[in-house]
């Protein structure tokens, strides 16, 4: 068995490629079942965010397993192998484990140390458990990754003042407003007519940061108006006008700054739509949805400026240098957590021998107990039989405790294998079945 990860991220692929591989929650079960149906895949879980799509697996054979996952991604995206493969990465065993720890800690994020990725890893664990695509190995690995992410944020300064995709989007709007006025600095949004399209988690964060940056009011649109009203109720100090998504044309005609973050599979704004509108002002669009909510053809229109998640690099790079030093603190934690998991993984090599040893001793115990009880005669009560049986089981457990602990203890693989051979020889244990 081998742990492997195959995927792509903002580091390896532009948004126009990433959006083709995005797997929304409503189709996650189907994707997991498809992957689990491959005879190479023993366990699987999927991390799908606006900046990455990563498939973590336990496979029978590393090369064949990685090939099977890559084939799935090609079929899912509709991209030819020559178009997709340059953007894919894959890691095997210790590199896969170390990569996941970095992801959960926020060290592989566009926004270094951002906290939202930890929630997304937790969601990956929940979906994998709900859809029963994970087994003991990935359960252990992903649960430890979540713990590692929490530990990094509590034991280092990396999480202090960390920005998110949403806060970076608001800063990008401030920066572009300043640049339009000939200033290379963040400008207030107080005079802007601002709209947010969507009422999910990213939109909640947008409202939070817009309020913090002095925004005077927001038009909030959502397919379900009630959800927009529920969200706006959490921001009593920010004037929010809730509207249904059907009012999108009105929003685009009247607002000067529009953020989009919906779960739509296709763009909800394109050039043909904007051409039909009588806009009152310059329109700045900032799209943090993946798949994208704003079609790329709008950039050719006069009076329209459009940005997507890949454009956030411009503001992220302004505060990354200071955070790089904080990341070095986190690396120490990641190395320790990776080592702990790999030690646990190595200890699994002893499990078949331990199980066969336990079964051998249990058979001896049961046989000898039966002989003893048969000699006791009918005067030996049921209660006394239970006491003797418990005694025999306790003796076996005491005998097994020290050798089992030693076989599972961290040690060089060569030393463990030698110890396993000695135990198998001493107790004449049958060899384990080879994994197919």
Swiss-Prot record:
What HAMAP family does the database record attribute to this sequence? Glu_tRNA_reductase
| Pfam families cross-referenced by the UniProt entry | GlutR_dimer (PF00745), GlutR_N (PF05201), Shikimate_DH (PF01488)
Q: Which organism is it from?
A: Prochlorococcus marinus (strain MIT 9303)
Q: What is the lineage of its organism?
A: Bacteria, Bacillati, Cyanobacteriota, Cyanophyceae, Synechococcales
Important for activity (site feature) positions: 99
PANTHER family the UniProt entry points to: GLUTAMYL-TRNA REDUCTASE 1, CHLOROPLASTIC
Q: Family per UniProt?
A: Belongs to the glutamyl-tRNA reductase family.
- Which amino acid positions bind substrate, per UniProt? 49-52, 109, 114-116, 120
Tell me its EC number(s), please. 1.2.1.70
Q: Which reaction does it catalyse?
A: (S)-4-amino-5-oxopentanoate + tRNA(Glu) + NADP(+) = L-glutamyl-tRNA(Glu) + NADPH + H(+)
Q: What is this protein called?
A: Glutamyl-tRNA reductase
Locate the residues binding NADP(+): 198-203
**Quaternary structure and interacting proteins, as annotated:** Homodimer.
Any one Gene Ontology BP term: protoporphyrinogen IX biosynthetic process
Catalytic residues, per the record, are 50 (nucleophile)
Class of the enzyme per the UniProt entry, highest EC level: oxidoreductase
Annotated domain remarks: Possesses an unusual extended V-shaped dimeric structure with each monomer consisting of three distinct domains arranged along a curved 'spinal' alpha-helix. The N-terminal catalytic domain specifically recognizes the glutamate moiety of the substrate. The second domain is the NADPH-binding domain, and the third C-terminal domain is responsible for dimerization.
> Extra info from the record?
During catalysis, the active site Cys acts as a nucleophile attacking the alpha-carbonyl group of tRNA-bound glutamate with the formation of a thioester intermediate between enzyme and glutamate, and the concomitant release of tRNA(Glu). The thioester intermediate is finally reduced by direct hydride transfer from NADPH, to form the product GSA.
Q: Which UniProt keywords apply?
A: Chlorophyll biosynthesis, NADP, Oxidoreductase, Porphyrin biosynthesis
Disulfide connectivity for this sequence is: none
- On the tree of life, the source organism's domain of life is Bacteria
Q: What role is this protein assigned?
A: Catalyzes the NADPH-dependent reduction of glutamyl-tRNA(Glu) to glutamate 1-semialdehyde (GSA).
Gene Ontology MF annotations: glutamyl-tRNA reductase activity; NADP binding
Its UniProt pathway annotation is: Porphyrin-containing compound metabolism; protoporphyrin-IX biosynthesis; 5-aminolevulinate from L-glutamyl-tRNA(Glu): step 1/2; Porphyrin-containing compound metabolism; chlorophyll biosynthesis
């Amino acid at each position: 068995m081998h742990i492997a990860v195959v995927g792509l991220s903002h580091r390896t692929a532009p948004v126009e490629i990433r959006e083709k591989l995005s797997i929304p929650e409503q189709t996650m079960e189907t994707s997991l079942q498809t992957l689990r149906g491959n005879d190479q895949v023993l366990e699987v879980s999927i991390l799908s965010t606006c900046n990455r799509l990563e498939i973590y697996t336990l496979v029978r054979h590393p090369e064949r397993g990685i090939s099977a996952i890559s084939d799935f991604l090609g079929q899912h995206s509709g991209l030819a192998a020559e178009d997709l493969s340059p953007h894919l990465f894959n890691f095997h065993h210790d590199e896969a484990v170390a990569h996941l720890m970095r992801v959960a800690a926020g060290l592989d994020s566009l926004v270094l140390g951002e906290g939202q990725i930890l929630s997304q890893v937790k969601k990956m664990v929940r979906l994998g458990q709900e859809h029963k695509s994970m087994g003991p190995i990935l359960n252990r690995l992903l649960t430890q990754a979540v713990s590692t992410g929490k530990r990094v944020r509590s034991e280092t300064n990396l999480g202090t003042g960390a920005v998110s995709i949403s806060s970076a989007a608001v800063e990008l709007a401030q920066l572009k407003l300043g640049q339009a006025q000939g200033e290379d600095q963040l400008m207030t949004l107080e005079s802007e007519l601002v709209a947010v399209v969507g009422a999910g988690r990213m939109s909640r964060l947008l409202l939070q940061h817009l309020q913090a940056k002095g925004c005077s009011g927001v038009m909030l649109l959502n397919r379900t108006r009630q959800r927009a009203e529920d969200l706006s109720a959490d921001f009593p100090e920010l004037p929010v006008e809730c509207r249904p998504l059907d009012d999108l044309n009105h929003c685009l005609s009247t607002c000067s700054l529009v953020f989009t973050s919906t779960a739509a599979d296709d763009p909800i704004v394109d050039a043909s739509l904007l051409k039909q509108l009588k806009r009152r002002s310059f329109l700045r669009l900032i799209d943090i949805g993946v798949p994208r909510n704003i079609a790329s053809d709008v950039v050719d229109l006069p009076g329209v400026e459009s940005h997507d998640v890949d454009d956030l690099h411009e503001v992220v790079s302004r505060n990354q240098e200071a955070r790089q030093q904080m990341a070095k603190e986190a690396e120490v934690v990641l190395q320790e957590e990776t080592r702990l998991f790999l030690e646990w993984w190595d200890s699994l090599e002893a499990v078949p021998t331990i199980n066969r040893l336990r079964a051998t001793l249990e058979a001896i115990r049961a046989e000898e107990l039966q002989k003893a009880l048969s000699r006791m005669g009918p005067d030996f009560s049921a209660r006394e039989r239970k006491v003797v049986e418990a005694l025999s089981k306790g003796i076996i457990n005491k005998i097994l405790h020290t050798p089992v602990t030693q076989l599972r203890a961290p040690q060089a693989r060569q030393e463990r294998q030698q110890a396993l051979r000695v135990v198998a020889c001493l107790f004449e244990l049958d060899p384990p079945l080879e994994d197919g």
